[in-house]
């Protein structure tokens, strides 16, 4: 059993460091049934002792790495622009069924709370940029859609599977990391533990 786990860990490290060109098959998805059966990895609230504000990284307690991306409408946005506000950083794609399933709850969350949602689209994995535009119109999304054209930000945040969500507090510290779709209640619960 230990040998199997070590082998799986070794493969995961190798797979994450593989720099081949990214396409749709490079990103796994997690569906609702996997979430309900407990296969969802969820790291939540962090005590102040665990927070190292000088430690930039992608783990709970780290300062979230800054990035700059263009929105679907062409505006340049940086994560640092949102310092002082709580941020939900969500990585997604239009072809991902669990991503599609959580979007209505994300829109409701955006409308009913003070959270700032940054939805980073893995644009390189899309068939066409127009698909993203059509998706946004179909779902009536009003929060910023950031276009990760070359999946550089997804790579920096080690995104695999999608959807993946980082809940970042007003100090820029990652408070929760979730793999798989979140529903509205889970989003509110995550928001309530952040500064």
Residue ranges and their predicted role:
Residues 134-142, 147-195:
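Thiol/disulfide oxidoreductase modules built on the thioredoxin-like
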Residues 1-63:
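N-terminal targeting signals for export/organelle localization
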Residues 83, 87-108:
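Conserved redox-active cysteine motifs that mediate thiol-disulfide chemistry
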Residues 56-61, 66-87:
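A short beta-strand-turn-helix
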Residues 100-139, 149-156:
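Structural microenvironment flanking redox-active thiols in thiol-disulfide oxidoreductases
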Residues 84-86, 113-116, 142-143:
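Loop/turn elements at helix/coil->beta-strand transitions in domains of secreted/extracellular proteins
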Residues 88-90, 119-121, 167:
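Hydrophobic beta-strand core positions in alpha/beta domains
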